[in-house]
């Protein structure tokens, strides 16, 4: 089966990392069409996945865009849609991996008469999307998609509650390669030395710096933890979110935590950095559709504490394979951090359980088999290694 994958992003986020794993088995007869140039294209090329930037300029539509802004963007979309329709005629299936890709993919599906699959990586709610964009996404999916793949039960539930057709949606979790998350003790020791964290109890936070990701929650919790607890933030702010970064530094200064917080910015050595942490914290204040960071921490053999909402509830069972806390409650988070610091053996057992469960439940080979089975209706060919 020949698949045309579509994605709007030039930068690799969770949806894009997921797409790499899905596209790999089909790479000898697939193309990933991007709407923006950037580092994601380089990452696809490193994985030997054919890629082409299809748009000449960035499409200016945000999740919270109004109807007028959305209609204005249609003029920008016309050349892109024309190109995608022409390209799609050479493929058996259009696979839209993001919401803007759904808009383009739906129209391309109509004109090229190719089936459309939409991979839903978002919780479609008014909390994250304008009413206009919500309506567009649901109507296009209902009208044009043969299949919607949701990355969690939480994403599926929100889709159906927003008016999505429950008969076309299936849940498939993200897949991971467990071996990527294995780091030697000597490498961990060296990394902690390089970071100046040898004697610290390190709580890692891995995500872009944004208010809803809740870095400020961890900083507030840190103030209530023993002095050997240090927070390590890995990730950058996107354009327009620099004010939040300034707020974080102001919060740190006001609480006198300058010597207990490190910002590393964007890093590519995530598994190694996670392995160098004693605990990984997920502190999103809004429901997370899936939570790749949670699974990655588990695969690294590190205990994880997650905000009890959205997809995280499907990944973490409290005190079985991790810890759950109420979103936006620093006091609860501080209690869990202190517990992990004091109850070392119990915490190690929980982390070991999590690693064993995650290695089986989210193995990329198993997940890709689930995807292939769903896509098999659109062609008799199976993916090659």
Label the model's feature ranges.
Residues 5-13, 21-74, 155-158, 170-171, ...:
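N-terminal strand-loop element at the rim of the active site
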Residues 13-21, 201, 208-224, 243, ...:
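A conserved mid-protein helix/loop that constitutes part of the nucleotide-sugar donor-binding site
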Residues 96-102, 120:
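Short His-centered aromatic/hydrophobic patch
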Residues 129, 157-161, 166-168, 175-194, ...:
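Acidic anion/phosphate-binding donor-loop and adjacent secondary structure
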Residues 240-245, 258-267, 273, 323-324:
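Active-site donor-binding acidic/aromatic loop of nucleotide-activated sugar
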Residues 303-306, 316:
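Short hydrophobic beta-strand element within catalytic cores of glycosyltransferases
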Residues 317-319, 323-330, 339-345:
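Conserved acidic donor-binding segment of nucleotide-sugar-dependent glycosyltransferases
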Residues 332, 339, 346-360, 367-373:
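A short, well-ordered alpha-helix in the C-terminal region of glycosyltransferases
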């Amino acid at each position: 089966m020949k698949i045309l994958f579509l994605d709007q992003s030039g930068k690799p986020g969770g949806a894009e990392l997921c797409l790499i794993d899905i596209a790999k088995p089909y790479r000898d007869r697939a193309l990933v069409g991007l709407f923006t140039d950037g580092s994601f294209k380089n990452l696809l090329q490193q994985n030997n996945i054919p890629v082409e930037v299809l748009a000449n300029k960035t499409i200016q539509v945000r999740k919270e865009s109004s109807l007028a802004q959305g209609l204005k963007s249609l003029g920008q979309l016309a050349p892109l849609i024309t190109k995608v329709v022409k390209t799609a005629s050479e493929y058996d299936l259009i696979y839209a991996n993001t919401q803007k890709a759904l808009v383009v993919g739906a129209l391309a599906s109509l004109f090229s008469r190719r089936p459309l699959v939409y991979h839903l990586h978002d919780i479609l709610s008014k909390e994250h999307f304008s009413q206009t964009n919500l309506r567009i996404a649901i109507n296009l999916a209902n009208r044009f998609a043969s299949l919607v793949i949701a990355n969690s039960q939480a994403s599926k539930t929100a889709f159906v509650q927003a008016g999505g057709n429950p008969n076309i949606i299936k849940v498939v979790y993200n897949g991971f390669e467990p071996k990527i998350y294995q780091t030697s003790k000597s490498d961990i020791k060296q990394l902690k030395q390089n970071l100046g964290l040898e004697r610290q109890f390190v709580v890692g936070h891995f995500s872009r710096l944004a208010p809803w990701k809740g870095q400020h929650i961890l900083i507030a919790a840190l103030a209530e933890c023993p002095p050997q607890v240090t927070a390590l933030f890995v990730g950058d702010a996107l354009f327009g979110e620099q004010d939040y970064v300034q707020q974080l530094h102001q919060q740190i200064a006001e609480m006198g935590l300058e010597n207990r917080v490190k910002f590393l910015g964007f890093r590519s050595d995530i598994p190694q950095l996670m392995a160098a942490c004693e605990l990984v914290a997920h502190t999103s204040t809004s429901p997370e559709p899936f939570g790749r960071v949670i699974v990655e921490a588990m695969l690294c053999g590190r205990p994880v504490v997650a905000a009890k909402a959205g997809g995280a509830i499907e990944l973490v069972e409290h005190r079985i394979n991790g810890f759950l806390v109420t979103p936006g409650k620093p006091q609860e988070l501080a209690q869990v951090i202190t517990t992990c610091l004091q109850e070392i053996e119990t915490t190690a057992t929980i982390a070991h359980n999590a690693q064993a469960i995650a290695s089986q439940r989210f193995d990329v080979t198993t997940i890709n088999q689930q995807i292939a089975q769903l896509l098999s209706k659109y062609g008799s060919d199976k993916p090659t290694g």
